[in-house]
Swiss-Prot record:
The keyword Transmembrane helix does not apply. NAD(+) binds at I175, D195, R200, L261, G262, I263, I285, Y286. Zn(2+) 2 binds at C93, C96, C99, C107. This is L-threonine 3-dehydrogenase. Zn(2+) 1 binds at C38, H63, E64. Signal peptide: none annotated. It is found in: Cytoplasm. The gene is tdh.
Amino acid sequence: MKALVKREAAKGIWLEEVPVPTPGPNEVLIKLEKTAICGTDLHIYLWDEWSQRTIKPGLTIGHEFVGRVAALGSAVTGYEIGQRVSAEGHIVCGHCRNCRGGRPHLCPNTVGIGVNVNGAFAEYMVMPASNLWPIPDQIPSELAAFFDPYGNAAHCALEFNVIGEDVLITGAGPIGIIAAGICKHIGARNVVVTDVNDFRLKLAADMGATRVVNVANQSLKDVMKELHMEGFDVGLEMSGNPRAFNDMLDCMYHGGKIAMLGIMPKGAGCDWDKIIFKGLTVQGIYGRKMYETWYKMTQLVLSGFPLGKVMTHQLPIDDFQKGFDLMEEGKAGKVVLSWN
């Protein structure tokens, strides 16, 4: 079968022939229909410092997907051949304190598909049946293909009550863009998104952000004055940029709450005085709650949330290089690849 493989310890990704995997007793074989390129895939493609210490060459990458059940392991029940599914890309142990306590998204033994084990950029893949998420007929496959990052955005946006609140989102990558839309969809008052990429800031505005701010040439505090704000009630940090995070701390209202998804560089500093004397709550966010986030994000789409606005490109798998080029240039929202 065809698969996108990190063949060499260098920049690039390679379309290769690899064996079709065989599902174990509790696994399902999935025939992939559509996959989407994540920022993680771009890191692996670029072969940056993180990927060099994390990824073993020879890995099939990818973790955003939708497909159909092609074969069932001998112990699998509850699914049918041909059923359309996506899946939670974090495979958890099931026996640690957090897994047994109903907090599997905090499993310390988590294994990520397309990072630690072979992933979804292939014609077929295997997944534990317990990780599958059935996709309702009303949801198009091109949207279901990126439910994984949509789930990151939903987990972050729903961590704190944003109804009637002023929300600051630092980072207009696809997850930040989707989070802006979710916050407006569920009733936030003002949603302000900051970045330095005008293309992606426009996508955030199209998704419903009240204001978008290119901080390279505009002051966030000036925008706050224009909106008659004293400070932000909720912050969603999506950029992994220390300067953006410190700007957020500076602009938070006393008692505000921050959900952090962006990964800061090691040793990055922050103004702890702002956190302490403003009484801020800072909550780390990783992945999706299993499977409450999946339920809520499915219902959001079924209730009219315009998730499709963040998708900018659909390409056949043979044009995968164009997709990675667009992502590297920052000239895309979500890029979806078709395996049909």
